[in-house]
């Protein structure tokens, strides 16, 4: 019997994780199945118990369940503990749940390895202070940007995140007023605004000459945030598809101790992207 894996979230129909992990399994010669399971907020513990009873081996967790997963696991990696968000669970034979967060690794690998980007010494702006943001802050700071600024419509959330991650580097959090008279080499959108076709309130001149923009959402067409970057002189306007594949590759390694090649899967997904879904979350 192949080992069983799944991704849990709501909504889940859009998820490309089953396709990605099936491709990884074929590429590496691993015998496993991977499915998408819709789970409502507040029902994750029940869903995980049912999956364990079916001898499941591991789970990915997507929106809106990452914080709930963090509260449920028996043990988690230091980065997941600090992020207070879990996107990968290893189900031990004794029933223990081991949690991790691979989002930060996925973002940094996509930016640096796949696109030749640079974080070290750069002024970096992170938009949003939810689970998508908290999962990537530590990985960004470990690349030693000159300064990381987090802004959020509710400033207190960004301030709390900055305080939590201050041991890892120069970081400031607050409201969008922090952006006045400031400019950045790299702007990362960790909000869900692209899903609604909306833009965060960014002032003119916020992107430095030659700067990059990165939207954690992805789609067949450029997201509205990527288009904003293109019209404001971005040297590169990138979406989060590569991050999705890279965080999945890290999760696959945690489960199977085999590291798949991500580039062929990213290229395959680009070819197959459904035009009916212009923006999708990780």
UniProtKB/Swiss-Prot annotation:
Binding residues annotated for shikimate, in chain numbering: 15-17, 62, 87, 103, 218
Keyword field: Amino-acid biosynthesis, Aromatic amino acid biosynthesis, NADP, Oxidoreductase
GO molecular function terms noted in the UniProt entry: NADP binding; shikimate 3-dehydrogenase (NADP+) activity
UniProt GO BP: amino acid biosynthetic process; aromatic amino acid family biosynthetic process; chorismate biosynthetic process; shikimate metabolic process
Catalytic reactions of this protein: shikimate + NADP(+) = 3-dehydroshikimate + NADPH + H(+)
Pathway: Metabolic intermediate biosynthesis; chorismate biosynthesis; chorismate from D-erythrose 4-phosphate and phosphoenolpyruvate: step 4/7
Active-site residues per Swiss-Prot or TrEMBL entry: 66 (proton acceptor)
One term under GO cellular component: cytosol
Its EC number(s): 1.1.1.25
Keyword Oxidoreductase (UniProt): yes
Residues binding NADP(+): 128-132, 152-157, 216, 240
Keyword NADP on entry: yes
One Pfam family, short name: SDH_C
Signal peptide: none
Subunit details: Homodimer.
Its biological purpose: Involved in the biosynthesis of the chorismate, which leads to the biosynthesis of aromatic amino acids. Catalyzes the reversible NADPH linked reduction of 3-dehydroshikimate (DHSA) to yield shikimate (SA).
Protein name: Shikimate dehydrogenase (NADP(+))
Source taxonomy: Bacteria, Pseudomonadati, Pseudomonadota, Gammaproteobacteria, Chromatiales
